[in-house]
């Protein structure tokens, strides 16, 4: 039976009748006035500014209100640490003086202190009783551990020492071969004056020589100029501004330790702020600059990524110690406007980079960009003028921030809608003067005339890009899209649409045809968007992967291996077409861009060709060369292939429409059921259907679509299973292109040779490639 634990006496001390001299404590509190309290100033959000004359706000806690008996002044009862120091000192001196007075003689012989000590002694005895059992248990455990350690030491001594055969004249040839395999010669970067650390990183990343935009921009940025850079997509604009930022970091913050103190964190400010129009581009910029930092020695730059869909609290913590900030305008403005002191930090940045500037600065988009730019240029009025502040202001005036602007299109006419009526600009590109006036109205440059760099003033498209046009009926775009996929079986394809609903439908349609399709649009959760991009761009992904996306993937995404771009819808603006097509043929690689054009879209396509290729067409016509490059080549698909594929597409569309209609119907029923529950009425789906049928929308706009959706959603499970079985049977066969299946040896075609050829295994027969 275990020993019963001794009980500790709770109240062993009794109050002494003799008044003792006791030190004054702040537990009881002091009665003070409102001006004697130690008020603390409340930090207001940066966005509040002066709030129409609001000067400030102070607060205090742990204070009780003491109301006077008559009409006297209201007092406050506060602890000693809530009172101002000079007031607290005077109160403590008065208290000690009063406590030191003689209080008379008591009849009690034993003082209270002795009783307290005796109670403590009893407590320590109880502790000793408990610790003896604990010590016995600990000693047993320790002895077991010691025995195990002794056995392990004996076993280690018994084992013979490993023998190493040391050979004379060790060669480092294997090490040299490994280094040569990982790194490349970067002597082409020497004229730009880049540091050895960054050259090491460029060598590991296999960037042997700079691109034209990098050669032109890096020296100007390093010398302190504002730069506006225009270059075609995939020309390396990220490194054009990333390398000078890291060079500044090496010169000023190379040996700077990581700050942990609040005062040090509050005094630190970021070096650069990089704005991006989309989350995917912001993540890509962060990935590229991080790779440049991690592969370079002595560069420990901390990069903060501020995008929507992720935790705000985590981003605020990372921002406190960041050197480079990359973000989208919406989330960046939310963090700055609700934070304390963040706006003052960002006003001290050295580099402001606006990537894809024509999109960020376009009219009617990204209102937060204007607010951010206005906040960065705002000067505080209410501050104390001291010598330190004056010196800081002088330093800020001596070294204001550099503004760096990059994009592939600066032509304002390219942002006009292609469809509809209206007056259109000519297709010529903006010259240097017009582009500078367009940007000077939006941005506050440090220099009167920033340096404008245009490495391809004539053509906006990549040199190795092939552009094609497929004319098809509007209701058969799915058929022609699937046919193009069959012509390019081992090509990584990016399909662009103008709506989110089209992305959802096409993704399900292609998946029903056993094609590895992924979706990407702005309504997806951020983790789902990142997952789609990662699966599509992974080196281990299927080489036939298809990404169906809206224009969120049109700008800045640098995914290696994209061979084909298909425009399912004609883009709304010409600059969108330029950036869509720029996802392929990047960094001297080749690629194709094919536009599916319906008869009602021919006007928009003609305007598109006039805007994008006007300068190149004019230059080619004025040249003496006989060959003239057409803007968009017409692509002719084999009609036999389209006829053979049509049954597959029809079955896949029926299955897809049924799934989408059923999903839409269930969501509508859920909404009506929840609304009926809120109103307290019974929900009957058949009654609602009868009422809707009575109203009738057969001839109105959308009536036919609703009828088709209802018919597609009313299919039974058996009918859907039958359609899937038929489609599965068709997909299991090759598309026959002129081979007799009944008499295999009667024709002039050698079927065995066709099966042995390792070409396009989708077709059975000779099918020509799409060459344009």
UniProtKB/Swiss-Prot annotation:
It is found in: Nucleus, Nucleolus. Residues 480-638 form the Helicase C-terminal domain. A motif (DEAD box) lies at residues 355-358. GO terms for molecular function: ATP binding; ATP hydrolysis activity; RNA binding; RNA helicase activity. Its main location: nucleus. Residues 1-27, 88-146, 690-715 are annotated as: Disordered. It catalyses: ATP + H2O = ADP + phosphate + H(+). ATP binds at residues 231-238. Keywords: ATP-binding, Helicase, Hydrolase, Nucleotide-binding, Nucleus, Ribosome biogenesis, RNA-binding, rRNA processing. Its EC number is 3.6.4.13. A motif (Q motif) lies at residues 187-215. InterPro entries: DEAD/DEAH_box_helicase_dom (IPR011545), Helicase_ATP-bd (IPR014001), Helicase_C-like (IPR001650), P-loop_NTPase (IPR027417), RNA-helicase_DEAD-box_CS (IPR000629), RNA_helicase_DEAD_Q_motif (IPR014014). Residues 125-137 have a biased composition (Basic and acidic residues). Belongs to the DEAD box helicase family. DDX24/MAK5 subfamily. This is ATP-dependent RNA helicase MAK5. It comes from Ajellomyces capsulatus (strain NAm1 / WU24) (Darling's disease fungus). The lineage of its organism: Eukaryota, Fungi, Dikarya, Ascomycota, Pezizomycotina. The gene is MAK5.
């Amino acid at each position: 039976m275990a020993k019963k634990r001794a009980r500790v006496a709770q109240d062993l001390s009794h109050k002494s009748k003799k008044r003792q001299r006791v030190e004054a404590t702040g537990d009881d509190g002091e009665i003070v006035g409102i001006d004697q309290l130690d008020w603390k100033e409340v930090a207001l959000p940066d966005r509040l500014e002066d709030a129409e004359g609001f000067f400030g706000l102070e607060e205090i806690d742990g204070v009780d209100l003491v109301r006077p008996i008559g009409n006297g002044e209201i007092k406050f009862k506060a602890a000693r640490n809530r009172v101002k120091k000079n007031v607290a000192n005077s109160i403590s001196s008065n208290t000690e003086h009063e406590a030191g007075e003689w209080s008379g003689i008591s009849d009690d012989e034993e003082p209270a202190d002795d009783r307290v000590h005796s109670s403590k002694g009893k407590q320590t005895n109880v502790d000793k009783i408990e610790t003896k059992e604990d010590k016995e248990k600990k000693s047993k455990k320790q002895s077991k551990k010691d025995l195990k350690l002794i056995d392990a030491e004996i076993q280690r001594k018994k084992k013979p020492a490993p023998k190493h055969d040391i050979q004379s004249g060790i060669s480092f040839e294997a090490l040299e071969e490994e280094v040569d395999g990982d790194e490349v010669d970067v002597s082409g970067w020497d004229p730009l004056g880049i540091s050895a650390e960054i050259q090491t990183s460029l060598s590991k990343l296999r960037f042997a020589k700079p691109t034209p935009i990098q050669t032109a921009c890096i020296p100007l940025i390093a010398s302190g100029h504002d730069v506006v850079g225009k270059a075609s997509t995939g020309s390396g604009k990220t490194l054009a501004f990333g390398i000078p930022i890291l060079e500044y970091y090496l010169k000023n913050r190379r040996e700077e330790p990581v700050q942990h103190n609040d005062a040090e964190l509050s005094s630190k400010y970021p070096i650069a702020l990089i704005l991006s129009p989309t989350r995917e581009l912001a993540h890509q910029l962060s990935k590229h600059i991080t790779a440049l930092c991690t592969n370079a020695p002595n560069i420990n730059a901390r990069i903060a990524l501020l995008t929507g869909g992720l935790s705000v609290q985590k981003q605020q913590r990372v921002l406190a110690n960041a050197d480079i900030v990359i973000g989208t305008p919406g989330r960046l403005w939310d963090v700055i406007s609700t934070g304390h002191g963040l706006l003052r930090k960002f006003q001290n940045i050295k580099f402001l980079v606006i990537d894809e500037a024509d999109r960020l600065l376009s009219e009617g988009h990204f209102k937060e960009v204007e607010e951010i730019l206005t906040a960065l240029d705002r000067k505080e009025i209410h501050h104390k003028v001291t010598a330190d502040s004056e010196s800081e202001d002088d330093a800020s005036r001596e070294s204001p921030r550099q503004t760096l602007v990059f994009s592939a299109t600066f032509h304002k006419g390219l942002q006009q809608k292609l469809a509809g009526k209206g007056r259109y600009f000519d297709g010529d590109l903006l010259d240097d003067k017009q582009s500078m006036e367009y940007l000077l109205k939006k941005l506050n440059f440090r220099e009167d005339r920033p340096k404008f760099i245009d490495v391809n003033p004539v053509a906006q498209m990549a040199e190795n890009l092939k552009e094609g046009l497929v004319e098809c009926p509007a209701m058969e775009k799915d058929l022609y899209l699937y046919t193009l996929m069959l012509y390019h079986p081992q090509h990584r394809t990016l399909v662009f649409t103008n709506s989110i609903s089209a992305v959802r439908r096409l993704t399900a349609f292609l998946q029903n045809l056993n094609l590895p399709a992924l979706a990407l649009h702005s309504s997806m959760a951020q983790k789902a968007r990142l997952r789609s991009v990662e699966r599509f761009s992974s080196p281990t992904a299927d080489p036939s992967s298809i990404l169906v996306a809206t224009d969120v993937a049109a700008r800045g995404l640098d995914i290696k291996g994209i061979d084909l771009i298909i425009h399912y819808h004609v883009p709304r603006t010409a600059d969108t077409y330029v950036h869509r097509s720029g996802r392929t043929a990047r960094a001297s690689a080749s690629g194709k861009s094919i536009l599916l054009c319906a008869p009602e879209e021919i006007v928009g396509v003609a305007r598109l060709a006039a805007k994008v290729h006007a300068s190149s067409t004019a230059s080619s016509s004025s040249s003496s060369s006989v060959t003239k490059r057409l803007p968009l080549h017409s692509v002719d698909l084999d009609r036999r292939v389209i006829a053979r594929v049509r049954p597959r597409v029809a079955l896949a569309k029926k299955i897809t429409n049924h799934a989408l209609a059923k999903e839409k119907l269930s969501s509508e029923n859920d909404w009506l059921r929840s609304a009926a529950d809120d109103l307290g009425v019974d929900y009957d789906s058949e009654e609602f259907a009868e009422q809707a049928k009575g109203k009738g929308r057969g001839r109105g706009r959308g009536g036919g679509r609703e009828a088709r959706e209802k018919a597609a959603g009313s299919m039974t499970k058996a009918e859907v299973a039958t359609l899937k079985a038929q489609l599965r049977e068709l997909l299991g066969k090759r598309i026959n292109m002129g081979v007799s299946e009944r008499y295999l040896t009667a024709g002039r075609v050698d079927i065995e040779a066709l099966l042995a050829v390792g070409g396009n295994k989708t077709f059975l027969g000779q099918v020509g490639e799409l060459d344009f």
